[in-house]
Curated annotation (Swiss-Prot):
GO terms for cellular component: cytosol. InterPro entries: PurM-like_C_dom, PurM-like_C_sf, PurM-like_N, PurM-like_N_sf, PurM_cligase. This is Phosphoribosylformylglycinamidine cyclo-ligase. One of its GO terms (molecular function) is ATP binding. It catalyses: 2-formamido-N(1)-(5-O-phospho-beta-D-ribosyl)acetamidine + ATP = 5-amino-1-(5-phospho-beta-D-ribosyl)imidazole + ADP + phosphate + H(+). Coiled coil: none annotated. Pfam families: AIRS (PF00586), AIRS_C (PF02769).
Amino acid sequence: MSKQPSLSYKDAGVDIDAGEALVERIKGVAKRTARPEVMGGLGGFGALCEIPAGYKQPVLVSGTDGVGTKLRLALNLNKHDSIGQDLVAMCVNDLVVCGAEPLFFLDYYATGKLNVDVAATVVTGIGAGCELAGCSLVGGETAEMPGMYEGEDYDLAGFCVGVVEKAEIIDGSKVATGDALIALPSSGPHSNGYSLIRKILEVSATDIENTQLDGKPLTDLLMAPTRIYVKPLLQLIKQTGAVKAMAHITGGGLLDNIPRVLPKNAQAVVDVASWQRPAVFDFLQEKGNVDEHEMHRVLNCGVGMVICVAQDQVEAALNVLRAEGEQPWVIGRIEQAAEGAAQVELQNLKAH
């Protein structure tokens, strides 16, 4: 017999029992998100989902995303309850812009050492996000990988599939000169620009946990969960049929995201004076001495979603959105793009 001690997976840093305990903890979370099309529960090799009834030519739409370095801030602050909603929002908001109804969601959670309480908190947030989006959490992967991550640090990724009627896909092809642009507010920086945000906090030596803006803790403002716009937007599409294009304002801000849904000959003219920028963005700009153009290229500056409708549909669209609890406003218009001009023009930019 060898004198070498018998090694186990746990000796190597992987706790199978912890993984199984997590699955038991989150089964109820997944159950709360269940849609009738989903077949079976957690634990199988693959998740099964039928196409919802009523579609003539259903088209599946998929998306995957993470939450960037907002996760580092969450780890530093030991605040894990809302990062799951961020993850869902980043995926489902990308699907709804083409008119798709999210069907199901899967997550990937990778860590050096699995902390069951933290992971369960994160997944509970994912479940809450799925409920807000009306999609089902059908499974995921929890990977304990010693030597790949520092201690209990973790990384997150999400994957979502939705469905849209082929004839009702929103792709921006009908956008025309004279159309109006409607904005929906963000809750804060959402899940983008956090490498810049963290650099600003570092360089300015901001005591993040003891700073308040307008009576609110800076930590709450920076960690506010990304808004999920799915249900109000699906209602807008259903009730008006007026939506020509939508842009989810993520990394790249207004300047890089609006052009993704515009025809080449269209220019979005955005009036920056049409909304009051939330204080957290002014704070970051001042502390980091950030150029105004850079602000709009990196951060959403208070705008989470932009919707394009014909001018004669503006009031109807605003009314539906307000009835859904949104606070929309007209942020700009579509004009013919001049030769070589940028596809987004920001008007009334303040001098910095």
